[in-house]
Amino acid sequence: MARWYRLGLMALILVMVWGCSTAQTLPEVNPVQPRFTKAGDGVITDHLTGLDWYVNPNPDQKFREAKAWAEGLTVAGGGWRLPTMAELKAIYQKDASAYHMDPLFQVKGAWVWSSELRNDWSVWGLAFYNNLQGWHSMDYGNGRVALAVRSRR
C-alpha cells in the first residue's frame, strides 16, 4: 500500500511541475478577429476564405455590364472578377442581416450575379435575402448587383 501511495504522490508532483512549466510557456491570447474587415478604399477582406471583395454601388446592372465592371476595376491594384456560386454561398450568413451577409457589404440589389453561365443567354445568381439560387437572362438588370472578388494580395 505504501508503494502505491508513493507512486501516486510522485505522479501528482510530476503533473503539478509539468503543468506549471507548461502554463508559463503558453502564447499570449489575441483578441478574436472578425471574419470580414473593410479597408478605407472599400475592399472587404474575408479572413476565413482569403478573398477580397468589392461592392458595385449600382444595383441595376445587366450581366455583361457587371462582368465588364468587375474585370475593369482598378481599386487596390486590380485583378478583380465576378465570383463563382461557391464563393457567393461562402459569404451567405443566415443570421447576419436582412440580406444574410455581413453588414459591411451594404448590397442594394435583390440578386447577385455569379460568373457561371447556364447557357448562351442566362447566368446563375444568388438571392441573399432567401438563399435562393437561380438563373436569369443576361439582359435582365433590374435588382441585379455585382460583387467583385479576387484572391487576397
Go through each PLM region and give its residues.
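Glycine-aromatic-enriched surface loops/turns that form tight recognition elements
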Residues: 2-81, 85-153
